[in-house]
């Protein structure tokens, strides 16, 4: 198997893209630490991996909390003995509202989960990757903030996704000498549960009409992508087949962002 003997940390690992990535990495032989804040969902995902013959453990932590993240990351390494792969998938859409409507607390929450959470994950995981002599990091960004800016009111979300890509490209240079690769996947419209935590308010005030060619997603005629399709790319970036790729965003959107 492609990742036999490797250990992976996946934040947001119990749902959506994170869960799909956890299942995919485990199926290829990786031992996976699934990190999230809902223990019951984590336990269910771990059982699913184990039922398929894989190895996994649940790590309950808030990605914005340094103490919880430090404990969780250390527990993973203590349990499996090493760390080779990090998938920073935890994130929220947050509140989408005009800039003069979204409150400071709403803004701060999106920034905290998506940007501070990414920072905290990498801040605490990179020392273990350095100790291991290398590794691969995959950050889950978005077409929003990197190619697409026409989702009205998504300013906080887009800022975090642009920020994640900046982190990836900055760290590609910083971490290269340690044989640590870092890349980003930028999904478009994907069938996940993330829309359940999107709170849209007065979006019409922040929206600009967009002229669409026929078919919202050219490759599929409008059909959304799947978390498993994103996970396939995460698997590629996690393994040795992408050994000369770093600092690179990959848009997984069926050409959707090229229309906007």
Specify the residue positions occupied by each region the protein language model found.
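Short C-terminal tail/terminal secondary-structure segment
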Residues: 4, 93-96, 234-235, 246-260
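Conserved glycine-rich cofactor-binding loop
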Residues: 14-15
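Short, small/polar-rich loop/turn modules that mediate ligand/substrate recognition or access, typified
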Residues: 87, 134, 176, 181, ...
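Substrate-binding pocket helix/loop in short-chain dehydrogenase/reductase
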Residues: 97-99, 103-111, 137, 215
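Active-site helix of classical SDR
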Residues: 122, 160, 168
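Alpha-helical segment proximal to the catalytic Tyr-Lys
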Residues: 127, 173-177, 243
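Residue(s) in the substrate-gating loop at a strand-loop-helix junction
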Residues: 142
């Amino acid at each position: 198997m492609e990742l036999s003997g490797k250990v992976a940390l996946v934040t947001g690992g119990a749902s959506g893209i994170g869960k799909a990535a956890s299942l995919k990495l485990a199926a290829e032989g990786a031992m996976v630490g699934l990190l999230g804040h809902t223990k019951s969902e984590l336990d269910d995902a771990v059982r699913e991996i184990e039922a398929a013959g894989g190895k996994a453990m649940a790590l309950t932590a808030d990605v914005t909390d340094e103490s919880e993240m430090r404990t969780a990351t250390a527990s993973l390494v203590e349990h499996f003995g090493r760390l080779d792969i990090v998938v920073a998938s935890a994130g929220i859409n947050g509140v989408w509202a005009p800039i003069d409507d979204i409150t400071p607390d709403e803004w701060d929450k999106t920034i905290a989960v998506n940007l501070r959470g990414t920072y905290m994950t990498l801040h605490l995981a990179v020392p273990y990757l350095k100790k291991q002599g290398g590794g691969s990091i995959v950050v889950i960004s978005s077409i929003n903030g990197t190619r697409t800016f026409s989702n009205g009111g998504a300013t906080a979300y887009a800022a975090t996704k642009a920020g994640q890509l900046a982190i990836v490209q900055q760290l590609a240079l910083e971490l290269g000498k340690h044989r640590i690769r870092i890349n980003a996947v930028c999904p478009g419209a994907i069938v996940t549960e993330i829309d359940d935590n999107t709170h849209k308010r007065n979006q019409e005030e922040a929206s600009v009409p967009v002229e669409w060619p026929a078919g919202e997603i050219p490759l599929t005629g409008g059909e959304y992508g799947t978390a498993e399709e994103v996970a396939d790319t995460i698997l590629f970036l996690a393994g040795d087949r992408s050994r000369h790729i770093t600092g690179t965003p990959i848009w997984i959107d069926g050409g959707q962002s090229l229309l906007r």
